[in-house]
């Protein structure tokens, strides 16, 4: 039970990291008979987080609610 909640916590952190990461766009161009040419553009469109203005009490309450629901669902 505790291990599944720990794994769920890590999964939530991983998903939040992806959601708050800047957009990355990758494209590949190729002709039918030639080698592929690829390029990648990283566009930082995410707003920077002002850690001083984060309401940690609200964040922890919401995280706990999600964790409790998930643990009840899994257990």
Curated annotation (Swiss-Prot):
Where in the sequence is Leucine amide found? 74
UniProt GO MF annotations? toxin activity
Propeptide regions on this chain? 27-48
One Pfam family this sequence matches = Pilosulin
Q: Which GO terms describe its biological process?
A: defense response to bacterium; killing of cells of another organism
The principal localisation class reads secreted
Task: From the UniProt annotation, give the residues forming the signal peptide.
Answer: 1-26
Q: Identify the InterPro entries for this entry.
A: Pilosulin (IPR049518)
What Gene Ontology cellular component terms go with this record?
Answer: extracellular region
* Subcellular localization(s) per the UniProt record: Secreted
The alphabetized UniProt keywords are:
Allergen, Amidation, Antibiotic, Antimicrobial, Cytolysis, Disulfide bond, Hemolysis, Secreted, Signal, Toxin
Tissues in which the UniProt entry reports expression = Expressed by the venom gland.
Q: What else is known?
A: Dekan et al., 2017 and Nixon et al., 2020 report synthesis and functional analysis of heterodimers with different disulfide patterns as well as different A and B chain monomeric forms.
Per the record, the similarity remark reads:
Belongs to the formicidae venom precursor-01 superfamily. Ant pilosulin family.
What does the record give as the function of this protein?
A: Heterodimer protein that may serve both defensive (pain-inducing) and predatory (insecticidal) roles. Has membrane-disrupting activity and shows induction of non-specific calcium influx into cells,. Shows broad-spectrum activity against a diverse range of bacteria, and cell lines, as well as hemolytic activity (EC(50)=2.18 uM). In vivo, shows moderate insecticidal activity against D.melanogaster and potent anthelmintic activity against the veterinary nematode H.contortus. In addition, intraplantar injection into mice induces nocifensive behavior and mechanical allodynia.
> Whom does it interact with, and what assembly results?
Heterodimer with M-MIITX-Mp2b (pilosin-3b) (AC P0C023); disulfide-linked. Only heterodimers (and not monomers) have been identified in the venom.
Annotated protein name in UniProt: M-myrmeciitoxin-Mp2a
Which taxonomic lineage does the organism of this UniProt entry have? Eukaryota, Metazoa, Ecdysozoa, Arthropoda, Hexapoda
